[in-house]
């Protein structure tokens, strides 16, 4: 049976793809869970059109993110924090703190795009990846400076 996928399905395809699947798989799993609909001329053409629109939108977003990437790639952002003995921070530097430091330079960036791993808990320089879009991952340097 031919179906048009409504959502991404693991090991099958992405939303908008037209796939040939077993009748039972379509009737008992895909269609009841609204992951797919039975393919006919109307919804097949609509799915192809929607997929084209989504690709254009994604390409536009990637282009904008590449421009943003060029403006922040390799730059150093300094964050001043209070420290105690042995340059140990009171608290930690989080993705939100880094996003605010970047925002202060005039670049709007969502904190969820920062690949921090875990919060920074010491003074020094740290390389951080910014995941802007698929294939667009600039690196920034965060310099954590202690103040008494």
From Swiss-Prot:
Protein keywords: Ribonucleoprotein, Ribosomal protein, RNA-binding, rRNA-binding
Domain of life per record: Bacteria
Gene3D superfamilies: Ribosomal protein L9, C-terminal domain, Ribosomal protein L9, N-terminal domain
Tagged with keyword tRNA processing: no
Single annotated GO MF: structural constituent of ribosome
Record InterPro entries: Ribosomal_bL9, Ribosomal_bL9/RNase_H1_N, Ribosomal_bL9_bac/chp, Ribosomal_bL9_C, Ribosomal_bL9_C_sf, Ribosomal_bL9_N, Ribosomal_bL9_N_sf
Gene Ontology cellular component annotations, sorted alphabetically: ribonucleoprotein complex; ribosome
BP terms from Gene Ontology: translation
Pfam annotation, one family: Ribosomal_L9_C
Family: Belongs to the bacterial ribosomal protein bL9 family.
Known function: Binds to the 23S rRNA.
Protein name (Swiss-Prot/TrEMBL): Large ribosomal subunit protein bL9
Gene designation per UniProt: rplI
């Amino acid at each position: 049976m031919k179906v048009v996928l409504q959502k991404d399905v693991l090991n099958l395809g992405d939303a908008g793809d037209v796939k040939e699947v077993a009748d039972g798989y379509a009737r008992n799993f895909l269609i009841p869970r609204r992951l797919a609909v039975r393919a006919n001329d109307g919804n097949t053409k609509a799915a192809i059109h929607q997929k084209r629109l989504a690709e254009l939108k994604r390409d536009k977003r990637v282009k904008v993110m590449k421009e943003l990437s060029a403006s922040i790639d390799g730059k150093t952002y300094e964050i001043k924090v209070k420290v105690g003995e042995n340059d140990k921070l009171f608290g930690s530097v989080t993705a939100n703190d880094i996003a605010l430091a970047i925002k202060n330079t005039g670049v709007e960036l969502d904190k969820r795009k920062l690949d921090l791993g875990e919060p920074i808990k010491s003074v020094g320089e740290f390389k951080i990846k910014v995941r802007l879009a698929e294939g667009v991952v600039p690196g920034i340097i965060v310099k954590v400076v202690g103040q008494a």
